[in-house]
Amino acid sequence: MEEIKKIPSRDQIPAEDKWAIEDLYPTDEAWEAELAALAESQKTLASFAGRLGESGETLYAYMEVFEQVNAKGDLLGSYCMRRADEDTRNATYQAMAGKFMGVAVALNAACSFDTPEIMAISDEKLAQFYAECPKLERYRRYLTNLRRRKAHTLSAAEEKLLASAGEMSQAPDTIYGS
């Protein structure tokens, strides 16, 4: 009869076989500080509401902030999710993952206006934006792909409601860990 192998604990695994999670954030405290800064980004994102159709410069400025917030969110999410995956019994990292999800949902709600506003910009006006703000070209592909879904886009209020439900939609994964 085969002997059942016991799964080694994390401290028994050689360093070269583990994620180099400290490359993302050296400590949990550094992660917490960065998460707090990310949460503050809600205000900056929300300050663009109702203004994306004003000019190419405004749209470009929003896209820059949006991209930076998403990049920072990717790092924060990777860190806490990898930490939570190390040992799913560790309540500290499960709580960090939950905290991150709360901030991510709030950020999604804060920028839920962007898709409807970008959709409302006419093709002619967007062409003018590209002409007056050449830096906006960097986001042409993203904006083009976004605008292709125009027929399937909700109003700003509906998008915000949907974005706010994000945490609730994660419940099955949180409960069952799948």
Language model segments and positions:
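A well-structured
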Residues: 1-178
